[in-house]
Amino acid sequence: EQASAFMGAGLLYGQTIIVQREFDAEDWLRLVDKYEASSTFSAPALVRMICALPEEVKERYDRSSMRVMVANAAPWSYALKQRYVADFPPGSLFEVYGSTELGVDTVLMPEDQMRKPGSCGKPAPGIEIMLVDDDGNEVTGTGPDHHGEVFVRSNSAFDTYYKNDVGYESNSRGDFHTVGDIAYRDDEGYLYICDRKTDLIISGGMNIYPAEIEAALEQHPGIYDVAVFGIPSEQWGEVVHATVVRSPGSSLTGGEITAFAREHLASYKVPRSVDFTDELPRTGSGKLLKRQLRAPYWAGRTAQVG
């Protein structure tokens, strides 16, 4: 859906659209160089592959034409943004938060990418955002301790789901609608997405957001990609687990990962177990299929929190 919107806008303004039949990181750079491509959009997984190419490969291609890179589909970690601005014009990076149902809701401008790590920006023009706590009250405070579910009022929002009015209405509060993301605001009005409500880990009564742990672990040079989720624990209900893709040439161990996590995270957020894989399951657009990683651990259980 997002691809259609971006390409449609490009055609409307008379731009040339360049389409890869199948993603290949070096070929993507070749196309940018050949056609002097000036704007694009991407999920983090694809940009991670581009930035991970050897320096001698990247240096073969001119990337200076890129004026707009829209980060979408999933949050880009601060570490990935640092890699991107080292390889591309720093003023080209924009980040948006939104969904199929609600459209584009926030925008983080290039000048704020390094200044506001973890933020997805401020409400886009014509967008109203309300945060609602677990008791149904509007959240008015700022900072990580004042988080709530994100509800959006937008003229581009769906009227309903196809043949599922009840499902859509259950995610609505009047003219405001949600897709289940949890966030907080800072004192300048910037929004920070904590995680999807369904990905929340509840361990010993503590709420843990996997996205925070993933962002911290991605700072380790030996970690190429990582997914964090909850697995069953008789004692705690759930505990934190990390599935890691090592960087090329890395021999990183689980013990080294947990030691690194202890330096950057509160003790209850440190992964209690780690495993390794060659590749994380993702959709064609690069979205992580975390449910596929979780499923084997929760097979035969009726709930994900004991």
Locate the predicted segments by residue:
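Beta-strand->loop->alpha-helix junctions that form or flank phosphate-binding loops
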Residues: 93-101, 121-123, 229-232, 275
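Short, P/G- and charge-enriched loop/turn segments at secondary-structure junctions
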Residues: 113-119, 169-171
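Acidic/polar alpha-helix N-cap and adjacent early helical turns
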Residues: 295-306
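Conserved ATP/PPi-binding loop(s) of AMP-dependent carboxylate-activating enzymes
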Residues: 122-126, 137-170, 208
